[in-house]
A protein has these predicted regions:
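A conserved regulatory-domain signal marking ACT and ACT-like small-molecule sensing domains
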Residues: 219, 224-245
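Substrate-binding/catalytic subdomain of NAD(P)-dependent oxidoreductase enzymes
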Residues: 90-186, 191-193
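Short helix-capping/linker segments at secondary-structure and domain boundaries
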Residues: 82-85, 123-130, 228-233
Length: 245
């Protein structure tokens, strides 16, 4: 359906679609002279797509890593803070609306893996498939694991990661030991954060709400406004008297 619609500007938050067809859709949009915007597809309210495409476009990005799924992060945060087991933390996430009735994609890392595929394309200009992402979820993470990590000075976080070396992308989503002094260790509950390394800027980090209707809505409306500005600029070229109010 989106392929048929791509003759007009398209705004989507559908990460399932983009993780499989992003390159095709971008090529179609370019050939048809229209915009394809998808800020809400990665990390909710964090403007990471715009940051990579525009703010960091003077850099060669070698690595990104981050907390890309709010449900999993909420569960791990609750297990750590309240010393509860995975099942009870998941029940609470579902009760509060942070987890779906079927949480499989979130807790098994599939949702985060889709975001890694999209972010790898943006960061490295390389197409990878979901099956290329080394994937381990958090359903097997126990309270004993969390406490053992704590005694060593670490927290367990579900980390999505992509690195670009020698023309190849290495991508993974897996529970990872993050030292308590690292910025990612302080990211709690439904919040997301993405750590990006560029050759000019060095280390950068983006933080914010990764889920929720307002965070997602903010990203979608931002895309809508950007498309409107593109349209205004084009129309003003044809008709200088026109100005978008």
């Amino acid at each position: 359906m989106v392929k048929n619609c791509i003759k007009k500007n398209v705004i989507t938050a559908n990460k399932d679609l983009l993780a499989v067809h992003l390159k095709l859709l971008e090529d179609l949009a370019e050939s048809n002279g229209v915009a394809l915007k998808f800020e809400a597809s990665v990390a909710g309210g964090i403007p990471i797509v715009n940051a990579i495409n525009n703010g960091l476009n003077a850099n060669n990005i070698s690595k990104f890593m981050g907390i890309l799924n709010g449900t999993s992060n909420f569960i791990l945060s609750k297990m750590t803070r309240e010393q509860t087991n995975f099942e009870d933390a998941l029940d609470e996430a579902q009760r509060l609306g942070f987890a779906e009735a079927d949480p499989t994609d979130d807790v098994e890392g599939v949702d985060a893996a889709r975001k890694v595929v999209i972010t790898s394309y943006l960061s490295f200009n390389q197409v990878i498939k979901l099956n290329d992402v080394k994937l381990t979820g958090i359903s097997g993470t126990t309270l004993s694991d969390i406490n053992a990590a704590d005694q060593l000075g670490f927290k367990i976080k579900l980390i999505g990661k992509g690195t670009y070396e020698n023309g190849h992308v290495h991508a993974s989503v897996e529970p990872t030991l993050i030292h308590k002094t690292h910025q990612l260790a302080a990211v709690e509950n439904e919040y997301n954060a993405i750590y990006v390394v560029g050759d000019a800027v060095g280390d950068t980090m983006f933080y914010g709400k990764g889920a929720g209707s307002l965070a997602t809505g903010s990203a979608v409306v931002s895309d809508l406004l950007n498309v409107a500005l593109i349209f205004e600029s084009y129309l003003h070229t044809l008709h200088p008297e026109f100005e978008l109010k």
